[in-house]
Amino acid sequence: QSHQWFAWPLGQATSMGIHESQSLFWENRIVKSKSFSKRFFKKFVSAGCTLNNYFELWKSINHLEAGLNRVEADELTYGLHILVRTELEIDLIEGGLPAEDIPEEWNKRYGELLGIKPSNDSEGCLQDVHWSEGAFGYFPSYLLGHLISAQISSQMERDIGLIDDLIQNGEYQKI
C-alpha cells in the first residue's frame, strides 16, 4: 500500500457521513435486496435458516417494526432513533436538559416518536457507547450516511447498471 497521501485530506475519510455511507450502502442496498436473498438463500438454509424460500428471507430482512435498538432499526424508523439522540444532545449541551433527566426524557421521546418504551436504561439511553466515550455530535453522521449511500446507489446504477443485476450475477467487484 502506498502511504504517499497519509496525513493529507486525500488520504483521509472526507467526513464521518461519507465513512458511514460505505457500510450503510452494503447493509441497506446490497443485503436488503431481493437479489441478495435469492442468491444466498441456500447458504442461509445451510447455516440453519428455517424459512421456506428466498422471498420469506427477503421479507424477514426487511421487516418494518419500531424497535428499541438503533442498530437493528428498520429504514422507516432509523431516522427517528437519530432524531431522539440528536435532540437530547442539543438540549444537554445547551443547558436545557440536566444529565440526570436523560433517561426520563429518552423514554418520553421514544414513546412519542416510536410508540415504545425501554424497560431499563440499558435498552434506552445507555445502549450506545458514543456518549460514554465523549462522542457528542456523531449521531447525525449516521443519517447523512444513509442519505449519501442512497445517492451513491443512484449514481452507481446510472454508471454501471442495475445493482440488483450485479448482485444476482455475483459481480461484486463492479460494485
Regions found by a protein language model. Give the residues of each.
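All-alpha helical catalytic cores of prenyl diphosphate-utilizing isoprenoid enzymes
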Residues: 44-67, 71-84, 116-119
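General structural signal for secondary-structure boundaries
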Residues: 29-36, 50-57, 98-101, 116
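C-terminal, non-catalytic "cap/extension" segments appended to globular domains
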Residues: 82, 86-175
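Short, mixed-charge, low-aromatic patches
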Residues: 40-47, 59-66, 100-111, 168-169
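Post-HExxH zinc-binding segment in Zn-dependent metallohydrolases
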Residues: 11-50
